[in-house]
Every structure is written in structure tokens, then in C-alpha cells.
UniProtKB/Swiss-Prot annotation:
The chain crosses the membrane at residues 30-50, 62-82, 100-120, 137-157, 169-189, 241-261, 289-309, 324-344, 371-391, 402-422, 495-515, 527-547. Residues 1-20 are annotated as: Disordered. The keyword Transcription does not apply. The gene is OTOP2. The lineage of its organism: Eukaryota, Metazoa, Chordata, Craniata, Vertebrata. Belongs to the otopetrin family. It is a multi-pass membrane protein. It comes from the Eukaryota. This is Proton channel OTOP2. It catalyses: H(+)(in) = H(+)(out). Its main location: membrane.
């Protein structure tokens, strides 16, 4: 000890040579986050203020802000496409996990529906141009241009890991993300106000009050000339309200892809970052029992019929409304119960699955898990409020029992489905066996599941029962070493994924296109009061709707990776 003190402190050994160093990201990211927070709070203030008649903020102010934001975001996207990516070594890496084909395909589909909605909006506001501000006609036109440019940008650049113009790219991506969130909030608020006025009209024998109130707010002296009285105007009005769900999903899909791009700015990737999202075209639609797709399609068709019956009967007299609610709750209880059991069975199958876990850094998967867990909170909140209202405040009749069962199954279904999806996303691809800590194990205890494993026989001790396969009989060897149990598990997981996917699609369609049993069933309205219950539903339900569509995207990925 004394000799060491006399010699003085030893020099630390030189650090090993590392790869290219990443630039310090905290400054640019912090600036972009602060920019997004401030812009989002401003947009949220105007949008929420414009939803109330007593607040002196008009919808024209909201349209003006959204139009300005879309113009600025479009200018930055054009700068990125025409200048940033054309710099030398601007995109040295591309993230294979980001922007899978089904996510970009869904973005294009929802973008097309958003363009149709913009056409309907333009036609609707042009029907009484003399009573409207010019910004109401300019806004859908600018939005159409923004959707076209942004969709192309995300299609070609979703996988980019940019290494030039870092601060500008961080701020531009975050501002574009904020623009999409502001558009989403405006659409959600507009649809919620429309639903609230529809409920008020059905309970007060008044006419459709929302359009009239908006028109008189814009031009109090306009008189009857501002009424949407023509058949074409009515078609435009109903059309763009029914297309709002697609606009909402487009904004959320774009926001998730922009966030992954923001995380990938300045990122260095290893040469083998784990499994890819790209499936083989041969195995994409094979190796299923077809029980899951058939049962899922059956529930989908029945769900559409139930939804149509509900929409037709719920606005009738008391007995027809009660009958519609019983049919609606009964179908949802069956669907939620089956999806809960199927999700639980999928998690049980994973207990016998020997595929290795994928621990590589993956911003896309991290975001998927966070969105699944966060979006489920909205439906959790509605369900717990319903449970309290049913247990504490109503007589126990058939409708109350169905409502309580529906709320409990909704909680269970979200919980077990999230467990199944999250565990599936963290599994490696088929054939990825977990690495053993003892590399030299007896060969008789191994089961090989791919061709590469056959070439590792030389590292094992000689065994008379195993022979080195020749190229001519490799196909026969694969048939010998492939275990039927693993094949059976893969088929079950594919069927489970397809069944859950189809069920989540119909469970998305019902609330997204106007099914509101929360207000038709007066249990919660009587217990909490309409004002409080409307706030709870209008805040939480959009997250529940988004959960369904995001679960569809994740389940499609689970199906491909199974």
C-alpha cells in the first residue's frame, strides 16, 4: 500500500477506440420541445375557447391559427426535401423499424379520406359564402395541400436518420408534430360539440342547433340566407362530419411517425439492429388455421349490423332506445369477452415459446408501448366512472347489469390485450432461439429450427446418431428438425392476431362514427349531471378511439412477426 502511495496515482488505461461519436443532442431537442409546448398550449387555448359561446374566441380565429401553422410546416417540409436531404452524407443511416409499410399505407388511406373531407368542407362553406369569412374556405384548401405534401414526406423520409441541420430539423419535426396535434384537437372538439348539440336537440325537440348557432355567431344579421337549406349543402355538411374520424386518425398516425423521425435525428445505427419489419411475401398469408380470420370477420359483419340498428333505433322513443342499448351492450359484451379470452390464451402460448427477446434499441417499439398504455387510460377512466354510477346510483335492472358488465370487460380486455401485444412486440423473429450460457451442450438436447443451426454440428461432440447433412438432403433434414409444436404455436399466434385485429376494427368503427351509449343510457348522465359527464366522455373517449386504431397497427405487426 505504501509503495503504491509513493508512486502516485496510476494513469487510467486509454479508452478503447469507439465508433463515430454522436453530437450532443440535449440542446436542440430541448429547444424543439419548448417550441412545441408553447405552440401547443396556444393552440389548445384558442381551440378550447372557441368551443364555448360565452368566450369571445371565434372559430375564425382557430382556423386562422391552424392555417398559419400548416403553411409554416409545409414550408419546412419543402426545405427538408429540397435542401436538407440533398446535402452530402445527410442521411447515412435508415431505421428499418420506423415507418413500416402498413403504417404508411394507413397514412395514405386516411390522407385520401381527409382530402375528401376537405372537398366537402369547401363545398359546405361555399354554399353560403356571403355569410362566411374567407378563412373558412381557405382553411380546407390549405389543409389539402398540407396533407398531400406531408404524406409524401412521411412516405419517403420516415426511416431517415438525418445528420445535417440538426437543430432546424428537430424544431421543424416537432413543429409539424404540434401542427398535427392541433388539427387533431380541433377535429375532436368540433365533433364533440356536434354530438353535444345533437343530444340537446333530441332532448328538447329543437332543430339541429349547431349550424344555426355558428352562423349567427359569424353574422348575427344574416337572417335566413345563412341557413343550410339546399340538399347539396346538407350532403356536404353530413359528409364532412362522417369523415372526421379519418382526419383524426390521419393526424395521430402522422404524429407518431414524426416523433420517431425526431428521435432518429443524429442517431447512429449498428449494422445489425435486430429483426426487420419487412415480411417475406410467401409467408405473409400462410400458416394459419383460418379460425381467427373467419370468426373475426363474422364478428365484424355482426358488429356492422348492430351498429346500424343502434343508430336507427337509438333516436326513437323510450322502448326503442332501450332495445337499441340492450343490443349494443350485448354485442360488445360478447366481443370484449372473446377478445379477453383470446388475448389471455396468446399470453399463455408465449409461456411455451422459446424465441429470444429483442433487447435492441427501438424508438418505434418504445413509442408503440407508450401509446398503447397511455391511450388505454381514457377507456379505463370512462369504465370506472360508469362502474361507480351503476353501483351507487341506479336500481339494478337489465340495462344497469349490462352496463356494469360492459365496463368491467372493457377494463379486462384492454389489460390482457396490452399484455399480449407488448410481449409480442418484444419477441424476436421466428427461429431466434435464446442464447445459451453454456455453448457446449450435448447435441441430443438441442432442437434446430433453421438451416443455419445445421452447420453448427461440428462444434458439438461426436454423436453417432447425428450426421452432417449434405446439400442434397437439407430439405429433408429441415423437415426432421422442425418441431411441429413450434409450427402449431406460430399458427395459433397468427390466428389470434388476426382475430384481435378485426375485433378492434369494429370496436373502432362504432364510437368513431357516432355511437354514444354514454349519453343514450342516462345512468351516468343522471348520476354525474350532463355537464360533468360530457366533459369526462369528450376528453377520454378520443383516447379510447385512438387506442383501437393503434392496436390494429400493432396487431398487424404482431401478425407479421409471428
Amino acid at each position: 500500500m505504501s509503495e503504491e502511495l509513493a508512486q502516485g496515482p496510476k494513469e487510467s488505461p486509454p479508452a478503447p477506440r469507439a465508433g463515430p461519436r454522436e453530437v450532443w443532442k440535449k440542446g436542440g431537442r430541448l429547444l424543439s420541445v419548448l417550441l412545441a409546448v408553447n405552440v401547443l398550449l396556444l393552440a389548445c387555448t384558442l381551440i378550447s375557447g372557441g368551443a364555448f359561446n360565452k368566450v369571445a374566441v371565434y372559430d375564425t380565429d382557430v382556423f386562422a391559427l391552424l392555417t398559419a401553422m400548416m403553411l409554416l410546416a409545409t414550408l419546412w417540409i419543402l426545405f427538408y426535401l429540397l435542401r436538407t436531404v440533398r446535402c452530402p452524407c445527410a442521411v447515412p443511416y435508415r431505421d428499418a423499424h420506423a415507418g413500416p409499410i402498413w403504417l404508411r399505407g394507413g397514412l395514405v388511406l386516411f390522407g385520401i379520406c381527409t382530402l375528401i373531407m376537405d372537398v366537402f368542407k369547401t363545398g359546405y362553406y361555399s354554399s353560403f359564402f356571403e355569410c362566411q369569412s374567407a378563412i373558412k374556405i381557405l382553411h380546407p384548401l390549405i389543409q389539402a395541400v398540407f396533407v398531400i405534401i406531408q404524406t409524401y414526406f412521411l412516405w419517403v423520409s420516415a426511416k431517415d436518420c438525418v445528420h445535417v441541420h440538426l437543430d432546424l430539423t428537430w424544431c421543424g419535426l416537432m413543429f409539424t408534430l404540434t401542427t398535427n396535434l392541433a388539427i387533431w384537437m380541433a377535429a375532436v372538439v368540433d365533433e364533440s360539440v356536434h354530438q353535444s348539440h345533437s343530444y340537446s336537440s333530441s332532448h328538447s325537440n329543437a332543430s339541429h342547433a349547431r349550424l344555426i348557432s355558428d352562423q349567427h355567431a359569424d353574422n348575427p344579421v344574416g337572417g335566413d340566407s345563412c341557413l343550410c337549406s339546399t340538399a347539396v349543402c346538407q350532403i356536404f355538411q353530413q359528409g364532412y362530419f362522417y369523415l372526421y374520424p379519418f382526419n383524426i386518425e390521419y393526424s395521430l398516425f402522422a404524429s407518431t411517425m414524426l416523433y420517431v423521425m425526431w428521435k432518429n435525428v443524429g442517431r447512429f445505427l449498428a449494422s445489425t439492429p435486430g429483426h426487420s419489419h419487412t415480411p417475406t411475401p410467401v409467408s405473409l398469408f400462410r400458416e394459419t388455421f383460418f379460425a381467427g380470420p373467419v370468426l373475426g370477420l363474422l364478428l365484424f359483419v355482426v358488429g356492422l349490423a348492430v351498429f346500424i340498428i343502434y343508430e336507427v333505433q337509438v333516436s326513437g322513443d323510450g322502448s326503442r332506445t332501450r332495445q337499441a342499448l340492450v343490443i349494443y351492450y350485448s354485442f360488445n359484451i360478447v366481443c370484449l369477452g372473446l377478445t379477453t379470452l383470446v388475448s389471455l390464451s396468446g399470453s399463455i402460448i408465449y409461456r411455451f415459446d422459446r424465441r429470444a427477446m429483442d433487447h435492441h434499441k427501438n424508438p418505434t417499439r418504445t413509442l408503440d408501448v407508450a401509446l398503447l398504455m397511455g391511450a388505454a387510460l381514457g377507456q379505463y377512466a370512462i369504465s370506472y366512472y360508469s362502474i361507480v354510477a351503476v353501483v351507487a346510483g341506479t336500481p339494478q335492472d337489465l340495462l344497469a347489469g349490462l352496463n356494469l358488465t360492459h365496463a368491467l370487460l372493457m377494463i379486462a380486455q384492454h389489460t390482457f390485450q396490452n399484455m399480449f401485444i407488448i410481449e409480442s412486440l418484444h419477441r424476436g423473429p421466428p427461429g431466434a432461439e435464446p442464447h445459451s450460457t453454456h455453448p457446449k451442450e450435448p447435441c441430443q438436447d438441442l432442437t434446430f429450427t433453421n438451416l443455419d443451426a445445421l452447420h453448427t454440428l461440428s462444434a458439438c461432440p461426436p454423436n453417432p446418431g447425428l450426421v452432417s447433412p449434405s446439400p442434397s438432403d437439407q430439405r429433408e433434414a429441415v423437415a426432421i428438425v422442425s418441431t411441429p409444436r413450434s409450427q402449431w404455436r406460430r399458427q395459433c399466434l397468427k390466428d389470434i392476431s388476426l382475430f384481435l385485429l378485426l375485433c378492434n376494427v369494429i370496436l373502432w368503427i362504432m364510437p368513431a362514427f357516432g355511437a354514444r351509449p354514454h349519453f343514450s343510457n342516462t345512468v351516468e348522465v343522471d348520476f354525474y349531471g350532463y355537464s360533468l359527464w360530457a366533459v369526462i366522455v369528450n376528453i377520454c373517449l378520443p383516447f379510447g378511439i385512438f387506442y383501437r386504431m393503434h392496436a390494429v397497427s400493432s396487431l398487424l405487426e404482431v401478425y407479421v412477426l409471428s
